């Protein structure tokens, strides 16, 4: 693999020499940083099993190497990356996999280690959505996830990835993560804080990542991280699990932040060792039981992961002064809910008791039941999935609901050819050789639901959302 020139400040190199265990070679560290990052993907098990995914992609000649800490994760090598970007493959467009850096799969593995089965989870800094979607898959779309993102521009990307992966149990918020300790005290079974950091571990992806690096900047970032972990710890219920992670390598933003929390709440913080998380985890293990992953250890990004348990309640923070405002949705009455459920089932949309129907004007939504306890405590950017809009003739079913709820064994499912599926993703109407009989058609490709179409004569009217429409070369190789 080709080398690339990474910018290293002298003070950074000095700091790394001091931080690196004697069992590791500093020359190996420098060499690893100069190598471009291996690409990796995670199979979305909400859509397809790992075995079926491997069978589906076998004809492509992809080399898939298992990632030891994530059984659905693989490093991927492809011969035709320039000819067809990974994000333009049919399997990516239909949500069968997520392009995710291998080391960033570690925090969720830690969160669910030792058969941990949380029902209400918060992802404090969630965009672009790799870890939120990984959490949802581990929860099998059950329970509820609060996915927060402070950056307004990234909330849209977060929602797009959640929708593409067919996730229904997520509520989105847009806050500074420091508000949650006061706003929702002791309400979560598990919390992931993948904290904003100096990004020292990402030089293999971005050779200029350290251009603005300084020890003073690290200190400022660490101060913010301490505030974030304190807030997250207050939002965690006693007995709950908190995973703290960064993609940086200095101890000030990593071990020191966790040790500060333990010093602040000595009777309430228990470090849970990660040495048994996967075979070979002990190579990155610190004396506290954290994983401090230097890039040469597993040939991935530099990363840090700590797992801790809240052993008892801690004094509450002052109640927030802000007003959340009126919640604009109301629950749908049982009789009407039954009619809606029946109509949805007729086009292949079904849901279980984890989701409940709510209404706002002519909009119908499905919210995860587990999030209802947070209503009135925080303001949501988006909650659950939009099921439909009502109109005089019935319901206008929404694309995100189709992707999350439809199953391909529906009587009205209609399998597209590769050329027809490509036309669908380009936002064009489809003219199949043999038109389906039903008026509402669940269109599938590779036996995966990709949308809902209206049959008009011999034409399938495209309903693919305009903001998702793709151009350029797609999976058939035609531009």
UniProtKB/Swiss-Prot annotation:
Q: Which GO terms describe its molecular function?
A: RNA binding; rRNA (cytosine-C5-)-methyltransferase activity
Example GO biological process term?
Answer: rRNA base methylation
What's the catalysed reaction?
cytidine(1407) in 16S rRNA + S-adenosyl-L-methionine = 5-methylcytidine(1407) in 16S rRNA + S-adenosyl-L-homocysteine + H(+)
List the Gene3D superfamilies hit by this protein, alphabetically: 3.10.450.720, Vaccinia Virus protein VP39
Q: How would you classify this enzyme at the top EC level? A: transferase
Q: Could you tell me where this protein is found in the cell?
A: Cytoplasm
- Keyword match Protease: no
* Record's protein name: Ribosomal RNA small subunit methyltransferase F
Taxonomic source organism: Escherichia coli O139:H28 (strain E24377A / ETEC)
């Amino acid at each position: 693999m080709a080398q690339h020139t990474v910018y290293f400040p002298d003070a950074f190199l000095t700091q790394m020499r001091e931080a690196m265990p004697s069992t590791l070679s500093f020359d190996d560290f420098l060499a690893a940083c100069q190598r471009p990052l291996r690409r990796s993907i995670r199979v979305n098990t909400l859509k397809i099993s790992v075995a079926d995914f491997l069978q589906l992609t076998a004809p492509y000649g992809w080399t898939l190497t298992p990632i030891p800490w994530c059984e659905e994760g693989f490093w991927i090598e492809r011969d035709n990356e320039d000819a067809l970007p990974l994000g333009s493959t049919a399997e990516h467009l239909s949500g069968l996999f997520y392009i995710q850096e291998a080391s960033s799969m570690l925090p969720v593995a830690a969160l669910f280690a030792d058969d941990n089965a949380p029902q209400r989870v918060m992802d404090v800094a969630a965009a672009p959505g790799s870890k939120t979607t990984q959490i949802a898959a581990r929860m099998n779309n059950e329970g509820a996830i609060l996915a927060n993102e402070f950056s307004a521009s990234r909330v849209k990307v977060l929602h797009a990835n959640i929708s593409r992966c067919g996730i229904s149990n997520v509520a989105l918020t847009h806050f500074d993560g420091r508000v949650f300790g006061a706003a929702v005290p002791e309400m979560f079974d598990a919390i992931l804080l993948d904290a904003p950091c100096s990004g020292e571990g990402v030089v293999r992806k971005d050779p200029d990542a350290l251009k603005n690096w300084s020890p003073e900047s690290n200190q400022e970032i660490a101060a913010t991280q301490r505030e974030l972990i304190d807030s997250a710890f207050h939002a965690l219920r006693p007995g709950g699990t908190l995973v703290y992670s960064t993609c940086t390598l200095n101890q000030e933003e990593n071990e020191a932040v966790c040790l500060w929390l333990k010093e602040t709440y000595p009777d309430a913080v228990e470090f849970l060792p990660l040495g048994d998380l996967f075979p070979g985890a002990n190579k990155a293990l610190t004396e506290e039981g954290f994983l401090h992953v230097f890039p040469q250890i597993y040939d991935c990004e530099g990363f840090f992961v700590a797992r801790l348990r809240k052993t008892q309640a801690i004094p509450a923070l002052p109640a927030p002064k802000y007003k959340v405002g009126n919640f604009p949705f109301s629950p749908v009455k049982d009789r009407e809910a039954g009619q809606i459920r029946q109509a949805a089932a007729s086009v292949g949309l079904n849901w279980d008791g984890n989701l409940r129907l709510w209404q706002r004007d002519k909009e119908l939504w499905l919210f995860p039941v587990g999030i209802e306890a947070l209503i009135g405590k925080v303001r949501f950017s988006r909650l659950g999935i939009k099921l439909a809009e009502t109109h005089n003739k019935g319901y206008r079913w929404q694309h995100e609901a189709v992707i999350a709820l439809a199953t391909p064994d529906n009587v009205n499912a209609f399998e597209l050819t590769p050329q027809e599926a490509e036309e669908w993703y380009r936002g064009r109407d489809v003219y199949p050789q043999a038109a389906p009989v039903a008026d509402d058609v669940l269109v599938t490709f590779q036996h995966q639901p990709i949308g809902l179409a209206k049959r008009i004569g011999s034409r399938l009217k495209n309903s693919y959302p305009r903001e998702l429409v793709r151009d350029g070369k797609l999976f058939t190789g035609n531009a």
